[in-house]
């Protein structure tokens, strides 16, 4: 059950990855770098908390 948030965050990261059909930027576009940083830090926090209790749940990453 602890792994569910980790998988949800991974799915969100995959869904927000740039694609070949990317639209050109407009002045209303928001840069995605802060969103990626927040998701990365949330994933690291969940991974650390999860790995302390369930070693099989650990996600390997940099």
UniProtKB/Swiss-Prot annotation:
Residues 1-22 form the signal peptide. It is found in: Secreted. Contains 2 disulfide bonds that can be either 'C1-C3, C2-C4' or 'C1-C4, C2-C3', since these disulfide connectivities have been observed for conotoxins with cysteine framework V (for examples, see AC P0DQQ7 and AC P81755). The modification Glutamine amide is found at residue 60. Expressed by the venom duct. Residues 23-49 form a propeptide. Pfam families: Chi-conotoxin. Disulfide bonds: none annotated. The cysteine framework is V (CC-CC). Belongs to the conotoxin T superfamily. This is Conotoxin Tx5.1.
């Amino acid at each position: 059950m602890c792994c569910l948030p980790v998988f949800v965050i991974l799915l969100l990261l995959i869904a927000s990855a740039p694609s070949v059909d990317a639209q050109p930027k407009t002045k209303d576009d928001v840069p995605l770098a802060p969103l990626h940083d927040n998701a990365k830090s949330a994933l690291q926090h969940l991974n650390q908390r999860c790995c302390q209790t369930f070693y099989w749940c650990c996600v390997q990453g940099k």
